From Swiss-Prot:
This is Trypsin inhibitor 2. Gene3D superfamilies: 2.80.10.50. The modification Pyrrolidone carboxylic acid is found at residue 1. Disulfide bonds join 40-84, 136-147. SMART domains: STI.
Amino acid sequence: QELVDVEGKTVRNGGTYYLVPQLRPGGGGMEAAKVGNEDCPLTVVKSLDENSNGEPIRIASRLRSTFIPEYSLVNLGFADPPKCAPSPFWTVVKDQSERLPSIKLGEYKDSELDYPFKFERVYAASKMYAYKLLYCGSEDEEEEMMCKDIGVYRDQEGYQRLVVSKHNPLVVGFKKAESSTT
């Protein structure tokens, strides 16, 4: 089965979408924020504004198809990233100062992890398609590669960070971004 957006249409490989939370309440879509000592907005967070779709995100699979099959590995990147960011692509960074590995904008260190995420359907009822976002990789060299939920962690500054977590999985839907580039 292929990924389907909130309107019941097939998610296009390389297309641009908003990732909007499907469980309310709890904030809006995904965006980049300056967190901690960052000089540039590099940390991926859920918007605190429930009415915000967040920033448009390009979703791509290495498969040569027009659609994205469910459970296939994908890369995610902001369609219009901050100019100061090293890359538009989402990656997982384990920082000693943070409790959980966070999703940030950055370069991949390993070509195997060029497509480190996947979506797993949670439920589909009355045209409501919702998916968990998972990170498929290892956080250190000794650890075996496996898929783990991406959850939300509210930090001391009040940001709702996207983190690799066993608790509070993020459940999203795909909302097509209106743009001349999609």
